[in-house]
Each structure stands twice: as structure tokens, then as C-alpha cells.
Curated annotation (Swiss-Prot):
GO terms for molecular function: cAMP response element binding protein binding; CCR1 chemokine receptor binding; chromatin binding; DNA binding; DNA-binding transcription activator activity, RNA polymerase II-specific; DNA-binding transcription factor activity; DNA-binding transcription factor activity, RNA polymerase II-specific; identical protein binding. GO terms for cellular component: chromatin; cytoplasm; cytosol; endoplasmic reticulum; endoplasmic reticulum membrane; Golgi apparatus; Golgi membrane; membrane. Residues 1-92 are annotated as: Transcription activation (acidic). A motif (HCFC1-binding-motif (HBM)) lies at residues 78-81. Residues 150-213 form the bZIP domain. The gene is CREB3. It comes from Homo sapiens (Human). First proteolytically cleaved by site-1 protease (S1P) that generates membrane-associated N-terminus and a luminal C-terminus forms. The membrane-associated N-terminus form is further proteolytically processed probably by the site-2 protease (S2P) through a regulated intramembrane proteolysis (RIP), releasing the transcriptional active processed cyclic AMP-responsive element-binding protein 3 form, which is transported to the nucleus. The proteolytic cleavage is strongly induced during dendritic cell (DC) maturation and inhibited by DCSTAMP. That form is rapidly degraded. This is Cyclic AMP-responsive element-binding protein 3. The chain crosses the membrane at residues 231-247.
Length: 371
């Protein structure tokens, strides 16, 4: 009996045989092999066995399901070759073995199906978070949409938590670095403040020294100025004392002494006035024979009581004449004989004596001290 397979089944069987490695035994014969297989009636499998085999072959394992769900990737295989007849032939030695194989095939397929069922693997964080939220997910796949949303939300929370922890860790490291820099800069600031205080103290000490030096300079300048002024005053006073003495000693022998004459003119009285000036001392001391000589304009020295003497100088004047002039007497007095003022006296002598002329004579009286 020949088993006829369609094109899809033939491709599937060719893929399986290629994976098992039996394809390379007779490549030349496989090309010339016919497509129909001649199997005995006892070796023909039943329909349900073929269905189970195909289901077991077509259903992927759990690991492949998880990988395909996380990262789907489609793999396409092109099968454009024919299968040889010898590759699919089965050589069974006995019927017992064939019966046992037919009896063990369903159990084996169930075990394989149980092993190949996809299981949901959760981490400890996911389990703890689900327990906190009071959610329960099944351990097998596939999951419903709500369960998938719950699982995604839980995983998103875990990712956010990890990212927050990482950001906190980085922030902590950054803050620690800033704190260390702040401590270092504060230490440097304290050192600089100490240096500034030291420099301020040095500046104050230098200012004190400068003030002391300025005070010393001012004192020295005041002392020098006072001493110089004192010396200058002494020199000026010495010069003032020496110059007049030198001038007087030089001029005493060479130049005649100049005497100033202070004159006073008495008012002329008429002859009819009974109160006329009488000079008894003059009448007693001046002789009569020398009256005309004295009246002619000569000088006469009269001794007054005490240490004073009077110089009488007679100058006849007309009634309408001007006051008498002052005459110096350098010949009579070579030395300063008169310490007091020289007073010119103008008087009208009495005519009873007979020695006064008609006119207004003037008399000069000069005091003379006799030491």
C-alpha cells in the first residue's frame, strides 16, 4: 500500500529528516527516488497518531514562546526538494516492538506536551510588588490582556524604581563630591582669612611706626626751627647793639656834634604894660659897659641857681619883623653840654635901665647842665 502525501506534508518530512542527518546517505538516489512510498499495511500509522505527531512537532517549546513574545522573529524556510523513499522507510524487526511503540506513543506525547507548556517566570521584585498590590497572575501562558497589562505595569514600576534608585545614587555621589569640595574650599578660606588677619596686624604695626617717625620728624623740625629762630634773634640783637656803638665811635671824632634847638617864642609885651619882664640876675651880672655889646647881638651865658646855666642870645628885631631864627652854635659847644631842651626866649626889656633898644628883641635861653 502506498501512502500518498501532499506537498506540505512532504516538505515537513523533508525538513525533519534533514535535521536528523539522514539526508546525506544517498543524495544521488534521492534525486532519482520516486515520490510514492511503499509501506506494508501493518506499518501504516493511524490518523490520530499522525495528528498527535504533527501537533507535537508544530507546537514550539515554552522557551521559544517566551522569546517569541518578547522579541518576535519569523523564520521562513523554502523546501523545494523531494524526499527519497529510503529515508522514510522504517525497518521494524518484530510486531511486538511495533505494538509497544504504538502503545507508548500517546503517553510520551502527553509528557512532552506537559514539559513544553509555557510557564510564566516572575522575579522576586515582581512577586513582592504583586503581593503588595494584591494581584495574582497565573503561572502558565498565555495570559489575558488584563493580566498582560498588569504585568507590564508591574515591570514598568520596577524599571522606574531602578531608574530612581540609580538617579538617587548618582545624586548622592554628586552631593558627596560637592560636600568634599565645600569642605576643602572652607579650609582654604580659613587659611586665607588667617593670612589676611596677619597682614592687617602687620599693616597696623607699620602704620604705628610711620606715625612715630612722623612725630619724631616734627619734633626734630620744631627743635631746629626754634633753635634757628633763637640764634637769629640773638644775631639780630647783637647786630643792633654793635652797629650803633661802632657808628658813634666812628663819627664822634670826625663829625661835629649836631645839637637840636628847641625854641619857644614869648609874646611881645608893650612898653606901657606894667607887667614887663624884669631880669635882676641879668642886671646884676652883666656890666654896664658891655651892655651895648650884648645888645649888638652877642651871646651871653647866665648862671642859674642849681646846676643849670642859661645861654642868652639877643637878636634885635623890628616890630614888624618875623620871629627869630634858630641858630646852631657848633663853635661854643664841641661836646653835648646841654642835656635839656634849648628854649628861645623873646622878651622886651625895660627901658628904665637904658640898655634896650627900640624894637622887639628876642632872647634865646638854653639850659646847660654843669656836671
Amino acid at each position: 500500500m502506498e501512502l500518498e502525501l501532499d506537498a506540505g506534508d512532504q516538505d515537513l518530512l523533508a525538513f525533519l529528516l534533514e535535521e536528523s542527518g539522514d539526508l546525506g546517505t544517498a543524495p544521488d538516489e534521492a534525486v532519482r527516488a520516486p515520490l510514492d512510498w511503499a509501506l506494508p499495511l501493518s506499518e501504516v500509522p493511524s490518523d490520530w497518531e499522525v495528528d498527535d505527531l504533527l501537533c507535537s512537532l508544530l507546537s514550539p517549546p515554552a522557551s521559544l514562546n517566551i522569546l517569541s513574545s518578547s522579541n518576535p522573529c519569523l523564520v521562513h524556510h523554502d523546501h523545494t526538494y523531494s524526499l527519497p523513499r529510503e529515508t522514510v522507510s522504517m525497518d521494524l524487526e518484530s510486531e511486538s516492538c511495533r505494538k509497544e511503540g504504538t502503545q507508548m506513543t500517546p503517553q510520551h506525547m502527553e509528557e512532552l506536551a506537559e514539559q513544553e507548556i509555557a510557564r510564566l517566570v516572575l522575579t522576586d521584585e515582581e512577586k513582592s510588588l504583586l503581593e503588595k498590590e494584591g494581584l495574582i497572575l497565573p503561572e502558565t501562558l498565555p495570559l489575558t490582556k488584563t493580566e498582560e497589562q498588569i504585568l507590564k505595569r508591574v515591570r514598568r514600576k520596577i524599571r522606574n524604581k531602578r531608574s530612581a534608585q540609580e538617579s538617587r545614587r548618582k545624586k548622592k555621589v554628586y552631593v558627596g563630591g560637592l560636600e568634599s569640595r565645600v569642605l576643602k574650599y572652607t579650609a582654604q578660606n580659613m587659611e586665607l582669612q588667617n593670612k589676611v588677619q596677619l597682614l592687617e596686624e602687620q599693616n597696623l604695626s607699620l602704620l604705628d611706626q610711620l606715625r612715630k617717625l612722623q612725630a619724631m620728624v616734627i619734633e626734630i623740625s620744631n627743635k631746629t626751627s626754634s633753635s634757628s629762630t633763637c640764634i637769629l634773634v640773638l644775631l639780630v640783637s647783637f647786630c643792633l647793639l654793635l652797629v650803633p656803638a661802632m657808628y658813634s665811635s666812628d663819627t664822634r671824632g670826625s663829625l661835629p656834634a649836631e645839637h637840636g634847638v628847641l625854641s619857644r617864642q614869648l609874646r611881645a609885651l608893650p612898653s606901657e604894660d606894667p607887667y614887663q619882664l624884669e631880669l635882676p640876675a641879668l642886671q646884676s651880672e652883666v656890666p654896664k659897659d658891655s651892655t651895648h655889646q650884648w645888645l649888638d647881638g652877642s651871646d651871653c651865658v647866665l648862671q642859674a641857681p642849681g646846676n643849670t646855666s642859661c645861654l642868652l642870645h639877643y637878636m634885635p628885631q623890628a616890630p614888624s619883623a618875623e620871629p627869630p631864627l634858630e641858630w646852631p652854635f657848633p663853635d661854643l659847644f664841641s661836646e653835648p653840654l646841654c642835656r635839656g631842651p634849648i628854649l628861645p626866649l623873646q622878651a622886651n626889656l625895660t627901658r628904665k635901665g637904658g640898655w634896650l633898644p627900640t624894637g622887639s628883641p628876642s632872647v634865646i635861653l638854653q639850659d646847660r647842665y654843669s656836671g
